[in-house]
UniProtKB/Swiss-Prot annotation:
Oligomer status and interactors: Homodimer.
Residues the record marks as active site: 14, 42
Major subcellular site: cytoplasm
Gene Ontology process terms (BP): 'de novo' AMP biosynthetic process; IMP metabolic process
UniProt pathway: Purine metabolism; AMP biosynthesis via de novo pathway; AMP from IMP: step 1/2
Protein name: Adenylosuccinate synthetase
Binding site for GTP: 13-19, 41-43, 306, 332-334, 414-416
Function: Plays an important role in the de novo pathway of purine nucleotide biosynthesis. Catalyzes the first committed step in the biosynthesis of AMP from IMP.
SMART domains: Adenylsucc_synt
Residues engaged in binding Mg(2+): 14, 41
Amino acid sequence: MGKNVVVLGTQWGDEGKGKIVDLLTDQAAAVVRYQGGHNAGHTLVIDGEKTVLHLIPSGILRDNVECLIGNGVVVAPDALLREIAKLEEKGVPVRERLRISPSCTLILPYHVALDQAREAVRSEGKIGTTGRGIGPAYEDKVARRGLRIGDLFNPERFAKKLHELLEYHNFVLQNFYKVEPVDFQKTLDEALGYAESLKPMIADVAARLHELRKQGARIMFEGAQGSLLDIDHGTYPYVTSSSTTAGGTATGSGFGPLYLDYILGITKAYTTRVGSGPFPTELFDDIGAHLASKGHEFGSTTGRARRCGWFDAVILRRAIEINSISGLCLTKLDVLDGLKTVKLCVAYRNAEGVVIEAPTDADSYVGLEPVYEEMPGWSESTVGIKSLAELPANALAYIKRIEALVGAPIDIISTGPDRNETIVLRHPFA
């Protein structure tokens, strides 16, 4: 029987999941997105050519790999079709290999308007949303009033539901946020205009996954964002609106947890975060600026600069627990090349003493200071190294210390952005 693997982020997103999914799909029959929307930004570098994907699974650049968008994803049809067009310009036959669940909730213009209006009026406590309508679309889904992709193929029903929704949302936009309403007819015409382009790609994704399972095919599930942004387990309220942990795989695809064989957690060799929210190891000095510059820490979706800090074993231990991580992939090790010393956060400290467990909400991080272990750095370059034996001794010691601190094996080490710049110690599909 085939093996089924989940790849997800263990920090606050931007860990390098796209590259690893692309690398591992040489042995997969299908890749599935199961949560999030086009707020994700997965960067792939293949033979020096960079591709950024937002909605389409990262397996799309591998010939003959099926790419599936599960019911847990919220879809902006205009953004999806633009992404398809860009890939087709590069000669990628997207429409032949992409299948989308009709149960995906749609992101429509009023979701974007609400998202941006809310963030604009927050005087403090800004969430740091991408402003792309993700949160409001999930709100409609949970409130059981969301429009789904399948609704596009029944124009009369779609128009009726849209009219009711716009009455509600426009009232909020005009009376609470004091902004212009969203036009019904324009929204209706645009949405129904997408139906013809999307229809050939619509399929029962859950049924297809179980077909593949029965055939013994290998399936990969590609997470977006990171575990500490999970709506339930993240640094609430500075989180995304979907289930970014391994549990979201089942609910967002219709593929039960019993069939998942290996969960790969992606973690940077340091820590980053975009937008607001707690970040105990954040650096405001030259080292932080160095990590941001050398690591090219700018969001692939928003272009926003990422906050940078030392590696945090406390949050990684929590991510390992809530995801049942089988093994880790350590990315961007090369960014630490040249530093005289490197630090790892092993615990936090507050007025009451030492804290070894990650808090369960943002407010509980207030007053926490990191407790660091310091290790010697390495002057040698790790860029492009493909075997453990070639690593500098101090870099290897750093890796081994992370394994000891978090209690999980590091099975893959990324030493550069290209898919070939990788050390694979244990293949998830093996």
